[in-house]
Design a protein with these regions (language model features):
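Aromatic side chains
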Residues: 14-16, 105, 143-144, 196
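Metal-dependent nuclease catalytic cores that hydrolyze phosphodiester bonds in DNA/RNA
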Residues: 1-102, 111, 210, 214-220
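Structural motif
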Residues: 4-11, 116-118, 182-189
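Metal-dependent nuclease catalytic regions and adjoining charged, substrate-binding loops involved
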Residues: 129-220
Length: 220
């Protein structure tokens, strides 16, 4: 299954909801709503090559394609910050050495915690790719636009835990892809804000009605 390359965007969709991921990738469906559109607007500000710039001792690069051949994952990093550091790494033909930070932009910060764990896993996947390309130990940062706050992620302290989780997700994604199966519905709080709700939940209701009807017949 390692021959199946998986995009980081696919990992993100699978984390949000495996069934929704299956509708997008197996059934090839896509529906946008307010939350999707808002996310696209926020990303459009950073996914623009003209937004790359230099500020004092920091070079900022946006929309950077990254990949990891061994793990078979790839994607685009919102923003890479290169800060001059004596303990950093060399980057291409740039003079000096740099500390590398990955910054992922998100629209809303969770109310009851510092960061969304699914967001952190997405950034960790970007880190794996970035570290492989630049041969570094990059820092992961989430920027939540609603509170205008940067959150540094605990990758150094929990590296093995995140690595194990990523490998587990890749195995599941590749298994469903090979079988051509859409994962079953798992109803959660995310359903109310999902753009696929009208496509997904009616199917569940119909299945329940059919099941109830069969039960009535069997009882008779």
């Amino acid at each position: 299954m390692e021959e199946i390359n998986v995009s980081i965007r696919n990992i993100q969709h699978y984390l949000y909801c495996p069934h929704r991921w299956g509708l997008i990738n197996i059934d090839c469906s896509w529906v946008e709503n307010y939350f999707v559109t808002k996310g696209n607007i926020i990303h459009s500000r950073v996914h623009d090559p003209e937004n790359s710039y230099i500020s004092r001792n920091k070079r900022v690069i946006t929309s950077l394609p990254v990949y990891h051949d061994e793990m078979g994952i790839y994607g685009v990093v919102d923003c890479i910050e290169l800060t001059k550091s004596a303990n950093g790494v060399q980057v291409s033909d740039l003079p000096g050495t740099y500390h590398i930070s990955i910054v992922e932009y998100k629209p809303r910060k969770p109310r009851d915690k510092d960061f969304n764990e699914d967001d952190a896993i997405q950034v960790f996947a970007q880190k794996i790719c970035t570290d492989s390309i630049f041969r570094c130990d990059s820092e992961g940062i989430l920027y939540y636009s609603d509170v205008k706050k940067r959150i540094r992620l605990p990758f150094h302290e929990q590296y093995q835990d995140y690595l194990k989780r990523i490998r587990q997700l890749l195995t599941e994604i590749r298994e469903y892809t090979m079988k051509g199966e859409v994962p079953p519905v798992r109803k959660s709080q995310k359903c109310s804000g999902c753009s696929f709700q009208d496509m997904c939940m009616p199917k569940v209701l119909v299945m329940k009605r059919h099941s109830n009807f069969r039960d009535m017949i069997e009882e008779d």
